[in-house]
């Protein structure tokens, strides 16, 4: 089972395309939708939905995957639910760059302070990070610097922020999922 979390643009047709691409790894791909506008509510909702899926799951190596803001959530929810994560261009600093787009961007900073202390150290090697060198929305170098000490970083030379085509990375994702 692969759980897919969309980014801020929840209505993007690219979400469906990514789900279809992920089905080459596992036919059971589940998209979990969330508001993107209310961080504390989103966290509760995502934890509840992912936990529900894991309770009914027969796959002993589930994976959670997210793009952009979905990558922010996939890393955290995956850690809290003890499943491996794959994140594409994760938005690591939504409290800085979501101003004017969501109701309370400061809630992201609050979530960070209330999260498990040093969670990335405890999550070491359980997240695969795929970053675009041509991310027009986020500073991918800053993301790499924050995540490199804990996770493997894969650089993509073609894609933009929304990562429309993930197919060049499917074999690596499949191998990462298999490690369970």
UniProtKB/Swiss-Prot annotation:
Q: Pfam families this protein is in?
A: UPF0227
InterPro entries according to UniProt: AB_hydrolase_fold, UPF0227, UPF0227/Esterase_YqiA
Name the Gene3D superfamilies on file. Answer: alpha/beta hydrolase (3.40.50.1820)
Q: What family classification does the UniProt entry report for this protein? A: Belongs to the UPF0227 family.
- NCBIfam families reported for this sequence: PRK04940.1
Q: What is this protein called?
A: UPF0227 protein YcfP
Identify the coding gene.
Answer: ycfP
């Amino acid at each position: 089972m692969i759980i897919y979390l969309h980014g801020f643009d929840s209505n993007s047709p690219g979400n469906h395309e990514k789900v279809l691409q992920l089905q080459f790894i596992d036919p059971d791909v589940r998209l979990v939708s969330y508001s993107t506008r209310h961080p504390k509510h989103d966290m509760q909702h995502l934890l509840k939905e992912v936990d529900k899926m894991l309770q009914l799951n027969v796959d002993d190596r589930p994976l959670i995957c997210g793009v952009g803001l979905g990558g922010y959530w996939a890393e955290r929810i995956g850690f809290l639910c003890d499943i491996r994560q794959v994140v594409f261009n994760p938005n690591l600093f939504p409290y800085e760059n979501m101003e004017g787009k969501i109701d309370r961007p400061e809630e992201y900073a609050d979530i960070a302070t209330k999260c498990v202390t040093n969670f990335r150290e405890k999550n070491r090697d359980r997240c695969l990070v795929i970053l675009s060198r041509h991310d027009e929305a986020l500073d991918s170098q800053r993301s790499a610097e924050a995540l490199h000490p804990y996770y493997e970083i894969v650089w993509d030379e073609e894609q933009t922020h929304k990562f429309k085509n993930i197919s060049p990375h499917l074999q690596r994702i499949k191998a990462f999922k298999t490690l369970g």
